[in-house]
């Protein structure tokens, strides 16, 4: 499996957002068995234990070793809502240790600060993770949903920049300025919510987001650009969206609880031609839609 530009994570990983612990166990095992070598989870997903059970089964049932699998999880920093206490040094360490227990691992390959909501504690959390990296509990430290201003806080203090930034990226939210900054600073780009333009993305009750009614209408349009491209290349709309990201050099984290779709998300051997990549580039609509409480990139 080809890895991302800085060799941090394999280019295609399994996302586990909104999976139950049991679903995460089932899909992690099935995905690794099929060829995935990167699993992405988070403390706030509450399914790290399921991922951990699957890993133990994989290491028992197959010849794969711990070093063959890349595991990403995330620190919930706090601060999203008033009742969401921001984590200090001690809270950050406790969260990491709990994730390691849940995963039944001695270290994680990539540990991300899940969002920039911790405002006054971002630097303290980063310092703490640097110390935990020195202790061998984390191989690579990164962030998620951080904008240029958040990253510049680290730069201004002379801290090493993150190994990766996991952000919402898809043809409707391409973030060219942030992407350029990340590339210029050798920060790996990991795209999540690649499938926002699909009509099936968060369409069930309780799956909240900032995706507008017009966006849903456009997703359902029988003549949408993605449907036309899917026909042209004889693939699914999801495969078009995922391949677009791969061809731009991003790592991706498609999530599915259906085995067939999980396999389709991995089988991306076709290529989108230059003309169609330019067509997709012109479909950008701007900001993020994944977080119902507002775009975390806008946090100061």
Language model regions located:
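N-terminal binding-site loop/beta-alpha segment at the start of enzyme catalytic domains
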Residues: 1-69, 195-198, 297-299
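Short acidic/polar active-site loop segments enriched in Thr and Asp
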Residues: 37, 106-109, 139, 163
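A short, structured active-site edge motif that brings together acidic residues
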Residues: 65-80, 110-116, 145
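Short, acidic/polar
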Residues: 20-32, 85-103, 124, 149-151
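Acidic-and-aromatic substrate-binding clefts and catalytic sites of carbohydrate-active enzymes
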Residues: 18-23, 42-50, 78-87, 117-121, ...
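Acidic (Asp/Glu)-rich catalytic clusters
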Residues: 3-4, 52-66, 100-104, 131-133, ...
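Beta/alpha (TIM)-barrel catalytic core signal, keyed to glycine-rich beta->alpha loops juxtaposed to Asp/Glu
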Residues: 116-300
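CE4/NodB-like, metal-dependent polysaccharide N-deacetylase domain
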Residues: 90-112, 131-135, 187
């Amino acid at each position: 499996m080809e890895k991302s530009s800085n060799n941090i994570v394999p280019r295609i990983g399994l996302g586990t957002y909104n999976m139950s612990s049991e679903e995460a166990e089932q899909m992690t095992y099935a995905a690794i068995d099929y060829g995935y070598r990167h699993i992405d989870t988070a403390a706030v997903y509450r399914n790290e234990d399921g991922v951990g059970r699957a890993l133990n089964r994989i290491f028992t049932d197959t010849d794969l070793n711990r070093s063959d699998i890349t595991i990403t999880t995330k620190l919930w920093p706090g601060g999203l809502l008033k009742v969401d206490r921001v984590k200090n040094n001690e809270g950050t360490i406790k969260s990491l240790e709990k994730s390691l227990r849940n995963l039944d691992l001695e270290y994680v390959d990539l540990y991300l600060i899940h969002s920039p909501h911790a405002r006054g504690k971002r630097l303290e959390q980063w310092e703490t993770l640097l110390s935990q990296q020195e202790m061998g509990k984390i191989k690579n430290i990164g962030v998620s949903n951080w904008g240029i201003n958040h990253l510049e806080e680290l730069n201004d203090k002379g801290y090493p920049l993150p190994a990766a930034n996991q952000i919402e990226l898809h043809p409707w939210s391409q973030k060219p300025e942030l992407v350029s900054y990340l590339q210029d600073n050798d920060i790996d780009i990991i795209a999540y919510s690649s499938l926002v333009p699909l009509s099936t993305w968060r369409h069930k009750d309780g799956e909240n987001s900032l995706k507008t009614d017009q966006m849903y209408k456009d997703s359902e349009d029988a003549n949408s650009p993605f449907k036309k491209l899917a026909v042209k290349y004889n693939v699914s709309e999801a495969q078009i969206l995922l391949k677009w990201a791969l061809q731009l050099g991003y790592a991706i984290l498609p999530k599915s609880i259906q085995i067939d779709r999980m396999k389709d998300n991995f089988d991306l051997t076709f290529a989108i031609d230059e003309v169609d990549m330019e067509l997709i580039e012109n479909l950008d609509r701007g900001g993020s839609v994944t977080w119902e409480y507002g775009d975390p990139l806008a946090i100061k």
